[in-house]
A protein has these predicted regions:
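A cross-kingdom marker for long, charged
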Residues: 1-12, 16-307
Length: 307
């Protein structure tokens, strides 16, 4: 919905009203923050036509209905914000989702003071700090953010499309960097890595749930509570892994993964900003539902499609 080029302001506001009605109040504010940070980046880089608060696409599928026989949904996607929302009766699926920020704070202008994705990172770091040395060693699958042991997209194929096997082997790419479940990775089979949460004490397990709750902020309150209960049921089947250092100033990546949820947090190198190495002010986060759970696929009937 590029307001200046594709739709009038009234249409943009109508789209935002659908998004606001679908998300939790705090989730809607998070989405707005991502849009505003994107707008701020456009101002900083002098690219307001392609980086602004409305530089997103909105797709509506099906006809909005409360009936389980008439599923529907919508997609909102663009730079640093992608949300999928699927409804079937009282069921709501809000994955996959992607939220990013470069930078992750606005320090001047209309939205000065806006911050995003700080809490997710702080909770992940707090969890890593709380682990025993042995647990930290198990969790830390690579010590460096760009480790020599990582297998790179196209690493051995010389860009030959017929030799691409990164869906199975890659652990680093120029776009997703350390993410395993980014764009074009729907239903990817990702091996469990790191330390098993069954070895955690009760306070550490609560931190896992707190992190997941923050990643699920877009969900309406009841849907989020139900999802957290589902995560609790599989808590001892959950794994936590970490890439990078875990000192106070270190950039890092972490993933929480179970049969019912997969969340990723990654500090990236600069794209529009100038940092060549990953830094804490460029952040990407992803939420996936494993086992064909994304886009409501697992609760659709047969070949049920939305148009």
């Amino acid at each position: 919905m590029y307001v200046d080029f594709l739709v009038p302001e009234s249409t943009a506001q109508s789209i935002l009203a659908v998004v606001e009605a679908s998300l939790s109040p705090e989730g809607y504010q998070k989405a707005l923050a991502a849009m505003r940070v994107n707008h701020f980046l456009g101002e900083v880089c002098k690219l307001p036509n392609i980086l602004n608060k409305y530089s997103y696409n909105f797709l509506l599928f099906g006809t909005p209905s409360a009936s389980a026989t008439s599923p529907w949904g919508w997609l909102l996607y663009g730079h640093h914000l992608d949300i999928s929302c699927f409804y079937k009766g009282t069921q709501v699926i809000m994955s996959p989702s992607f939220t990013g920020a470069e930078p992750n704070i606005i320090d001047e202008g209309e939205w000065k003071g806006t911050k995003i994705l700080h809490k997710e990172g702080s909770l992940g770091w707090k969890l890593m700090q709380s682990l025993s040395h042995e647990q930290q060693q198990k969790a830390q699958i690579f010590k460096e953010m760009r480790d020599e042991g990582m297998k790179q997209v196209y690493g051995n194929s010389n860009n030959d499309e017929t030799k691409r096997d990164e869906l199975i082997t890659d652990t680093w790419g120029p776009d997703d960097q350390r993410h395993r479940c980014g764009a074009f990775r729907d239903n990817r089979i990702v091996p469990y890595e790191g330390v098993q949460v069954s070895s955690f004490d009760s306070s550490q397990k609560e931190l896992i749930l707190s992190i997941c709750q923050e990643f699920l902020l877009y969900h309406p309150t009841k849907a989020r509570q139900l999802k957290l209960e589902q995560i609790k049921q599989h808590i001892n089947e959950t794994y936590f892994c970490w890439i990078g250092g875990f000192g106070e100033d270190d950039a890092f990546y972490f993933r929480i993964q179970s049969p019912v949820i997969l969340v990723e947090f990654d500090h990236h190198s600069g794209v529009f900003l100038t940092n060549k190495e990953p830094a804490k002010y460029h952040t990407h986060t992803i939420v996936r539902t494993p086992n064909a759970g994304d886009y409501g696929q697992a609760i659709r009937e047969g070949n049920e499609k939305l148009e």
